UniProtKB/Swiss-Prot annotation:
Entry binding sites for ATP: G10, G11, E12, G13, A14, G15, K16, S17
Signal sequence range: none
EC code: 2.7.4.9
Gene that encodes the chain: tmk
InterPro entries: P-loop_NTPase (IPR027417), Thymidylate_kin-like_dom (IPR039430), Thymidylate_kin_CS (IPR018095), Thymidylate_kinase (IPR018094)
NCBIfam families associated with the record: DTMP_kinase
Protein name: Thymidylate kinase
Membrane-crossing segments per the record: none
Catalytic reaction equation(s): dTMP + ATP = dTDP + ADP
Annotated CDD domains: TMPK
GO MF annotations in UniProt: ATP binding; dTMP kinase activity
GO terms for cellular component: cytosol
HAMAP family hit by this protein: Thymidylate_kinase
Length: 210
């Protein structure tokens, strides 16, 4: 079976990891080889970069340094994990990818969109999502969920609400620009309803007839 690359995008607390687990179960039940991964992270060096980016270790970073660390982590993630997995026929399900960079470092931080896209293309080369599932959620709801979850990875959650609103708008704008690839899904629903919507999209998109 041909490898597929499916990315999950959205703001904080949108439920990406939960829905990746749900889709993984559905695919594996039908004999699909699945690899789940995340960004930043996914391989040892990229996970070390993640620690800097999403915890208090990164508080002193400016926007340029933050971006360069993200791109370095992505380069190694693609090289070490994503490209080999796709070549071996796995379906790769990734929690965040290039769209998050455009939304957070572009929409949220105010970075130059065309320049970010150029850098992104240079880093990823021929690796590009077959499908992107955008879990859309009001930032006030998502941030409340994330706060209840707790943990040390709270650096971005501490940004102002206006930052997260800009991130959301950037995601939605990208979905309008690329409607064939990037599918917005209402994440303010019960987990199983969101999972069912995602499965219908995946099944229909790839003509899955198991």
């Amino acid at each position: 079976m041909q490898g597929r690359f499916i990315t999950f995008e959205g703001g904080e607390g949108a439920g990406k990891s939960t829905q990746i687990a749900q889709l993984t179960q559905s695919l594996q039940a039908h004999g699909v080889k699945v690899l789940c991964t995340r960004e930043p992270g996914g391989c040892p060096i990229s996970e070390r970069i993640r620690e800097i980016l999403v915890t208090g270790q990164g508080d002193d970073l400016d926007g340029t340094s933050e971006l360069l660390l993200i791109l370095a982590a992505r380069h190694e993630h693609i090289r070490q994990v994503i490209r080999p997995a796709l070549a071996s026929g796995h379906w790769v399900l990734c929690d965040r990818f290039e769209d998050s960079t455009l939304a957070y470092q572009g929409g949220g931080r105010g970075g130059d969109g065309p320049w970010l896209r150029q850098l992104g293309q240079w880093i990823r080369g021929d690796v590009f999502p077959d499908l992107t599932l955008l879990l859309d959620l009001d930032p006030t709801v998502g941030l409340a969920r994330s706060k209840r979850r707790g943990g040390q990875e709270q650096r971005f959650e501490q940004e102002a609400l206006s930052f997260h609103q800009q991130v959301r708008q950037a995601f939605l704008q990208m979905a309008q620009q690329e409607p064939q690839r990037m599918i917005p899904i209402d994440a303010d629903q019960p987990v199983q309803m969101v999972a069912a919507t995602i499965w219908r999209e995946v099944e229909g998109r790839f003509f899955v007839s198991f």
